[in-house]
Every structure is written in structure tokens, then in C-alpha cells.
């Protein structure tokens, strides 16, 4: 099992652990209490910095209940943390946009992440035809 060096930048959050022992995703928590009005945005501090292994990256996403509970959206849809973001003060943050007034308490579970290997190198081969039937265009799958 790989070991990852982590620095906790807040004493207000619980230590990282797998989600209830039944997932390979790990919860991330708000490192401080934040109040947002509808239409405001901020970088929500997550209270950690870590050194990812070479060749790996972290995929950060909101929890499925985050929008329902707080009315916030992760403004970049998905966060990618690569292994070069590994300094003592390189705190992970979640860019959020509030759709309604909300209060996020320190230690609230707000996001989740997993660590993935980088995509292997690929080479693109340009062609005039792909040789497969068209399926109706983007957004058409499942239409009657």
C-alpha cells in the first residue's frame, strides 16, 4: 500500500479516511466555517496539503449531497491536483458558487477525491472518416 505524505493545515477537520470503509473515495472537509450569499463564490479551504506519488493525480468532486445540503456548485466541475502541487502551503481548495444563501461549518464533508494514475501517452492519427456509423450527435443518446 503506497504511503502519501500529508500535512494538515487545520485542527478543525477530521483526519482523512476512506468513506465508511466501503468506497475507494475519500471525504474532504471544510477547514473553516464559511457563509456565502446567493451569487457569491469562493475558494473553500480543505485544510490539507499532500505529496502525491510521481505519475499520479487526485480527482476532486463534490459529494452527491453537497448541492442539496448547501446549494453550492463546484465551479470548475472537477478539480485535478497533480503531483507538482506538493508544497508545504499548497492547500487543496474547492472553488464553489452559491446558488442560495448558505453556511458551511468547519469539518462539514463537502467533497471527495480519489488518486488515479496519469493517462498513458497517446498519439493522435488524423483521418477523414472514422469508419463507424454516426449515432445522432452529442446529447442524442437515449432519445426516442
How would you name each of these model-derived features?
Residues 1-144:
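DUTPase catalytic domain/fold
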Amino acid at each position: 500500500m503506497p504511503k502519501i505524505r500529508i500535512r494538515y493545515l487545520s485542527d478543525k477537520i477530521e483526519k482523512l479516511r476512506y468513506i465508511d470503509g466501503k468506497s475507494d473515495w475519500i471525504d474532504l472537509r471544510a477547514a473553516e466555517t464559511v457563509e456565502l450569499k446567493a451569487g457569491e463564490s469562493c475558494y473553500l479551504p480543505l485544510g490539507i496539503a499532500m505529496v502525491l506519488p510521481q505519475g499520479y493525480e487526485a480527482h476532486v468532486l463534490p459529494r452527491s449531497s453537497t448541492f442539496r445540503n448547501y446549494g453550492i456548485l463546484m465551479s470548475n466541475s472537477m478539480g485535478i491536483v497533480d503531483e507538482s502541487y506538493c508544497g508545504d502551503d499548497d492547500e487543496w481548495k474547492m472553488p464553489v458558487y452559491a446558488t442560495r444563501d448558505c453556511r458551511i461549518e468547519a469539518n462539514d464533508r463537502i467533497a471527495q477525491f480519489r488518486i488515479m494514475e496519469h493517462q498513458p501517452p497517446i498519439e493522435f492519427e488524423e483521418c477523414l472518416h472514422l469508419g463507424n456509423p454516426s449515432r445522432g450527435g452529442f446529447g442524442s443518446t437515449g432519445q426516442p
